[in-house]
């Protein structure tokens, strides 16, 4: 399995959110997508998920351009809840089951209960930590080749953070491509074997963790790259 981007770009209102990005990931890769807010991480994930289209270049999964056919092979945990106000945690599972044939509703409800999510509770009443558990439970209940997690531990408490990391870690050896977007490097470094560093929409460093660290902590590499940028 290969996920390949070539000269990938995306513009919004004439400004590049992502510019001339090139990379290749293979099955079994657990890749950290690193950078401060506004670096292009979410835009890249939305391109991979087929939620937005490239302004230039290409992105392919096993040689197929990202689009309707590949959407069924990509699971995406976004940063926000996007459900209707009236929907319950149980309703979210029904919603996913209607859209994704690979969604295991029974596994989702089991995972949600283990996460102490109220199946009949309205999503709009969930705390930020519970919202993160909901989005992760939905994504992990799909049998997708590519699984993406956008800022999965941002703004959550320590207990929720540990639960999220454990749930993602359980997929490490599944042969899938896992892509984890974050700026909280230290907490997720142990999950990954590769890293992509984005800055102002451009890929500034990429490779295996051993290559990019060169014997240092990944957090030190992050500071070296982004130390002069606001918001780091």
Language-model segments: which ranges?
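The feature captures the beta-strand-to-loop junction immediately N-terminal to the Walker
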Residues: 34-36
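Helix-to-loop junction immediately C-terminal to a conserved catalytic motif
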Residues: 49
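Conserved ABC transporter NBD signature motif
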Residues: 56-70
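ABC ATPase "signature
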Residues: 206-207
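Catalytic Walker B motif of ABC-type/P-loop ATPase nucleotide-binding domains
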Residues: 147-151, 156
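ABC-family P-loop ATPase nucleotide-binding domains
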Residues: 80-134
């Amino acid at each position: 399995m290969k996920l390949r981007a070539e000269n990938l770009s995306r513009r919004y209102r004439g400004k590049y959110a992502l510019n001339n990005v090139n990379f290749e990931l293979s099955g079994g890769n657990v890749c950290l997508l690193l950078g401060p807010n506004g670096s292009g991480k979410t835009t890249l994930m939305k391109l991979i998920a087929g939620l937005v289209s490239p302004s230039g270049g290409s992105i392919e999964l096993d040689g197929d351009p990202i689009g309707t056919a590949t959407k069924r092979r990509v699971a995406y945990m976004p940063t926000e809840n996007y459900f209707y106000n009236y929907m319950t945690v149980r309703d979210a599972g029904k919603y996913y089951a209607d859209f994704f044939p690979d969604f295991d509703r029974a596994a989702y409800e089991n995972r949600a209960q283990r996460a102490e999510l109220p199946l009949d509770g309205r999503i709009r009443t969930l705390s930020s930590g519970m919202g993160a558990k909901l989005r992760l439970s939905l994504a992990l209940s799909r049998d997708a080749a590519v699984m993406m997690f956008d800022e999965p531990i941002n703004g959550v408490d320590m207990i929720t953070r540990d639960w999220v990391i454990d749930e993602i870690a359980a997929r490490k050896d599944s042969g899938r491509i896992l892509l984890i977007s974050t700026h909280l490097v230290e907490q997720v470094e142990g999950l990954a074997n590769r890293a992509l560093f984005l800055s102002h929409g451009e890929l500034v460093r990429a490779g295996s963790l051993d290559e990019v660290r060169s014997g240092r902590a990944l957090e030190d590499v992050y500071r070296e790259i982004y130390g002069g940028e606001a918001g780091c």
